[in-house]
Amino acid sequence: MVADAVAKVCGSEAIKGNLRRSWGVLMSADIEATGLTYLANLFTLRPDTKTYFTRLGDVQKGKANSKLRGHAITLTYALDWFVDSLDDPSRLKCVVEKFAVNHINRKISGDAFGSIIEPMKETLKARMGSYYSDDVAGAWAALIGVVQAAL
């Protein structure tokens, strides 16, 4: 199942191109702010997901919450590893499966993890401006699908 999701992403030049271009735009901005924007969108659009983050304390504090900041930074570096692995399907599978372990330990299912798609779309819109497109959002949904398959 993971192998199929990886093949879909790594086998598509369009998906890889959209991921790389959009990640380049996001990385040229403040990487920490991108992660914090994503988490704020997640908690606004999917308030039910806050229950997965109780160990981080008051997530409403945003940047003032060092645990939340740490999670935002870690998340963006994980995404960076994913994008860097697009030309090596076995490597992408390995880094995604490692990432998935933390979520499996917190009993987050693939379906529950899918709740990040809409907040990711909103983050892309906010951070990319005129560079955003539905194709970009679709590419990120496909990459999220790899993680979902690993869960």
Swiss-Prot record:
It comes from Anadara trapezia. This is Globin-1 subunit alpha. It comes from the Eukaryota. Pfam families: Globin. The keyword Heme applies. Keywords: Acetylation, Heme, Iron, Metal-binding, Oxygen transport, Transport. Heme b binds at residue 103. SUPFAM superfamilies: Globin-like. Belongs to the globin family. The keyword Transport applies. The lineage of its organism: Eukaryota, Metazoa, Spiralia, Lophotrochozoa, Mollusca. InterPro entries: Globin, Globin-like_OT, Globin-like_sf, Globin/Proto, Mb-like_M. Heterotetramer of two alpha chains and two beta chains. The modification N-acetylvaline is found at residue 2. Residues 10-151 form the Globin domain. One of its GO terms (molecular function) is heme binding. PROSITE patterns: GLOBIN.
